[in-house]
Amino acid sequence: MNLIEQLEREEIERLGKTIPDFSPGDTLVVNVNVVEGDRKRVQAFEGVVIAKRNRGLNSSFIVRKISSGEAVERTFQTYSPLIASMEVKRRGAVRRAKLYYLRDRSGKAARIREKLPARSVQQENVAEALQP
């Protein structure tokens, strides 16, 4: 194991942040700490994850949303102290790791299908038992 990787892993553990499991296509709500003068408040940024960059402590992700008809993209550092919390609102079914093509699309063309939860073996057995 590399010394730098070990230090990064220890730093991530020290931060103790709970990062939800998300992937591109998911709708994510990121609560960000915003400092305005002497006041500190939490601002929610909800949008679709269009890219995720996994680099240990330097991991980041890009969230895109449409605000008042204008597209807004924001890059977040995954382990940033500015992020108060993250929540996955909706899982998206996509076949790409980077969804940059959404930048060229608007309206219904920019929709993402919802990923349905996988059926477990137990559910299938119950469904078969219920059929006459």
Curated annotation (Swiss-Prot):
Q: What GO molecular function annotation could you give as one example from this UniProt entry?
A: structural constituent of ribosome
Keyword Ribosomal protein annotated: yes
Keyword Ribosomal protein annotated: yes
* Name of one Pfam family that matches: Ribosomal_L19
Q: Tell me, what is an example of a GO biological process annotation in this record? A: translation
Give the family, as the similarity comment puts it: Belongs to the bacterial ribosomal protein bL19 family.
**What function is annotated for this protein?**
This protein is located at the 30S-50S ribosomal subunit interface and may play a role in the structure and function of the aminoacyl-tRNA binding site.
Q: What is this protein called?
A: Large ribosomal subunit protein bL19
Q: Which organism is it from?
A: Nitrosomonas europaea (strain ATCC 19718 / CIP 103999 / KCTC 2705 / NBRC 14298)
Its taxonomic path starts at:
Bacteria, Pseudomonadati, Pseudomonadota, Betaproteobacteria, Nitrosomonadales
